[in-house]
Amino acid sequence: MLKDLFVKRQYATVKSSTLKKSISEEKPNIPSGMWEKCDKCNSMIYAEDLENSKFVCATCGHHFRLNAKERIKVFFDKDTFKEFWKDLKTTNPLDFKGYEEKLKSTKTDSTEAVVTGVGKLNGIEVACAIMDSFFMMGSMGTVVGEKITRLIEHATENKLPLMIFTASGGARMQEGIFSLMQMAKISAALAKHSEAGLLYISILTDPTTGGVTASFAMEGDIILSEPNALIGFAGRRVIENTIKETLPDNFQKAEFLLEKGFVDAIVERKNMRACIYKILILHGVRN
């Protein structure tokens, strides 16, 4: 009897597999894509709320990057945008190894890093190019350059104002000199558009860098930017290693460029339509 008092009590045991199964069954079944995390403040945002706010965080004001399709939906009058030259396809002029595979692996609705066409803003017809950083980081190759050049020529012939939403990592290295040539080609077309007395508005979005910054992004009659957008040519580390100096924390941000006179205004996404409409009216553009 006394001996039984010192016998260790038997506790109930649960098999590991049973426990794991029980825990997994208790997890809520949340469909993927229902929530998005803000990169700046880490807030979790309901996807529908994010779309309704034009993909801007309600907590901190962070502007999410948009693909071309989202940008068109946010900016233009509903169902007014008509895309041009969608069937232009990239080739591999330098036989760069793995280039075709990289193009095929790019999972986006766009067929290239820019969408070009004509749309309406409060009834006013404008020619517009929307760069897509989700397609090979918005890099500029021959097709990107050709589509933008054709759009500028179309705007010149039809006396249309021009807008370009820039978002790019720069020239596409897989196309070498063919890619770099697009800078001069686009700039030449812009010069003719300007000589015709037509308006060109450049809207810089995050990120706008490299050869795009060195050419048409900074050639607008009016240059606007979304808040906190990364804008520059060479990377921060490259510059610091070259000049042997530490750069300011906000270097290559839209606010820094505004302070230095490289940007005319920083406009929040919710105000972009109204701002550009006002600019068009002030410049005598009508329906």
Curated annotation (Swiss-Prot):
Which co-factor is required?
A: Zn(2+)
- Where exactly are the transmembrane stretches of this chain? none
Q: Name one GO cellular component term.
A: acetyl-CoA carboxylase complex
Q: List, in alphabetical order, the GO biological process terms annotated in this UniProt record.
A: fatty acid biosynthetic process; malonyl-CoA biosynthetic process
Pfam families xref list: Carboxyl_trans (PF01039), Zn_ribbon_ACC (PF17848)
The record's comment on cofactor binding reads: Binds 1 zinc ion per subunit.
Q: Which residues form the signal peptide?
A: none
Q: What is its main location?
A: cytoplasm
Pathway stated in the Swiss-Prot or TrEMBL entry: Lipid metabolism; malonyl-CoA biosynthesis; malonyl-CoA from acetyl-CoA: step 1/1
Which EC class heads this enzyme's classification? transferase
**E.C. number(s) listed in UniProt:** 2.1.3.15
Q: CoA carboxyltransferase N-terminal domain location, by residue?
A: 34-287
Task: Name the chemical reaction catalysed here.
Answer: N(6)-carboxybiotinyl-L-lysyl-[protein] + acetyl-CoA = N(6)-biotinyl-L-lysyl-[protein] + malonyl-CoA
What UniProt keywords apply to this chain's record, in alphabetical order?
ATP-binding, Cytoplasm, Fatty acid biosynthesis, Fatty acid metabolism, Lipid biosynthesis, Lipid metabolism, Metal-binding, Nucleotide-binding, Transferase, Zinc, Zinc-finger
Give GO terms: molecular function aspect only.
acetyl-CoA carboxylase activity; ATP binding; carboxyl- or carbamoyltransferase activity; zinc ion binding
Question: Where found?
Answer: Cytoplasm
Q: Where are the zinc fingers (C4-type)?
A: 38-60
User: Please, which domain of life does this record's source organism belong to?
Assistant: Bacteria
Q: Which SUPFAM superfamilies match?
A: ClpP/crotonase
Q: Is the Lipid biosynthesis keyword given for this protein?
A: yes
How would you summarize the oligomeric state and partners of this protein? Acetyl-CoA carboxylase is a heterohexamer composed of biotin carboxyl carrier protein (AccB), biotin carboxylase (AccC) and two subunits each of ACCase subunit alpha (AccA) and ACCase subunit beta (AccD).
Which HAMAP family does the UniProt record give?
Answer: AcetylCoA_CT_beta
The record ties this protein, via NCBIfam families, to:
accD (TIGR00515)
The UniProt entry's sequence similarity note says: Belongs to the AccD/PCCB family.
From the Swiss-Prot or TrEMBL record, give the protein name: Acetyl-coenzyme A carboxylase carboxyl transferase subunit beta
Q: What is the native source organism of this protein? A: Clostridium beijerinckii (strain ATCC 51743 / NCIMB 8052)
